[in-house]
Amino acid sequence: MLLNLNGIRVDCVIGERPDERTRLQTLRVDVRLEIPDRAAETDALADTVDYAALAERIRAALVAARCRMIERAAKVAADVCCAEDKVTSAVVTVTKRGAVPGLESASAVCETTRKNKENE
């Protein structure tokens, strides 16, 4: 079963330039989780990922991380996702609008599995 969480908004410090290190910018985080099918059968929250709680953990992790690169932000968010017991894999896209003049947005994608996480 795939579970998508689209458009998680995170206001955090992100960027390399000195002016970016002193202000909050908004990231969009999109998450695709592979989870067991059980919740589709039981219709019970206990059998799936509490995505409201997961979104808050992603926000907190990115605020604390103060990443310079969106690539790092994507990995931080993916690690949070794979720390969930019911998640077997995660694909996380982090998008930063206005990263450079003349560019609408830049995004980084991190794909990880619980197996990859356990081998670190």
Model-derived regions: residue spans:
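N-terminal, polar/charged subdomain of small-to-medium soluble alpha/beta proteins
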Residues: 1-120
